[in-house]
């Protein structure tokens, strides 16, 4: 099989391409390197560099057996600084990918949604535009009869995660702070809870969605079903590194909790996520 991965130079995309190659597939990546790195290129995959809005220009009428659409402007806080770019990548880019698939009769798209869907979309440009991206996918599914599956991610961490303070998740940011002998910064009171899901499990979920012919009327929820407070995570870091903690003011769009409750991916796809958080911190 031949698959296209948008966002293939990013954290999740790179891990996904590794899995697809190990499964014996051909892989093409399209990435604009806004958060991904050219250093993440893997042998035996083909790489193109541009935004997904220009997918038709970059890839022409190439045929694929499926598209994993991961390419997006990620993270809540940067979306307040550049809402227009977030709209272009997350809405216009998603429409372009769906239209490319329709015109080239590509059988399936798996779209990377977000658990922010479960909070008020108006809380941030990121949440709103990921929500609209899902609606674009549903439009193409319902109007054109396409197989467009939505996979909602819950707080992904693991090997290759960004340590950039702007684009990284809390684990990546804290890793950077620890390496510089700085206190780890806790936003707000630290009692906000997150369903931390290892990238290995996210990739396995994505592949199960793509490889199976099982369709979901809404979205596949990819989370462990267990959440930790940020304070609990901070205690793991303190126990591992002996670092200090520093509380900073809360931020816009910082929702109180994420937790996967829907069991469809587990029950219908046989997906088996594991709680790997403490093991991951211990092995840093």
What do the PLM-derived regions correspond to, one by one?
Residues 12, 86, 129, 170, ...:
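Hydrophobic alpha-helical packing elements
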């Amino acid at each position: 099989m031949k698959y296209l991965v948008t966002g293939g130079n990013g954290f999740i995309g790179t891990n996904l391409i590794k899995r697809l190659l190990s499964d014996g597939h051909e892989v093409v990546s399209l990435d604009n390197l806004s958060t991904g790195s050219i250093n993440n290129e893997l042998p035996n995959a083909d790489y193109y560099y541009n935004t997904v809005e220009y997918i038709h220009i970059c890839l022409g009428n190439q045929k694929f057996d499926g598209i994993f659409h991961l390419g997006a402007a990620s993270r809540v806080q940067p979306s307040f600084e550049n809402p227009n770019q977030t709209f272009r990548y997350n809405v216009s880019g998603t429409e372009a990918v769906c239209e490319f698939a329709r015109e080239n009769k590509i059988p399936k798209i798996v779209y990377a949604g977000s658990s922010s869907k479960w909070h008020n979309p108006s809380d941030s440009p990121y949440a709103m535009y990921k929500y609209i991206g899902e609606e674009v996918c549903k439009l193409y599914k319902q109007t054109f009869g396409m197989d467009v599956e939505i996979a909602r991610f819950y707080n992904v961490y693991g090997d290759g995660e960004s340590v950039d303070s702007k684009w990284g998740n809390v684990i990546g940011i804290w890793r950077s702070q620890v390496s510089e002998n700085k206190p780890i910064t806790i936003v707000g009171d630290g009692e906000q809870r997150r369903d931390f899901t290892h990238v290995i499990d996210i990739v396995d979920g994505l592949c199960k969605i793509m490889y199976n012919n099982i369709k979901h009327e809404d979205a596949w929820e990819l989370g462990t079903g267990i959440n930790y407070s940020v304070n609990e995570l901070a205690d793991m870091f303190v126990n591992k590194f002996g670092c200090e903690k520093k509380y900073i003011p809360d931020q816009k769009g910082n929702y109180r909790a994420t937790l996967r409750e829907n069991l469809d991916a587990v029950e219908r796809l046989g997906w088996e996520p594991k709680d790997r958080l403490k093991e991951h911190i211990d092995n840093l």
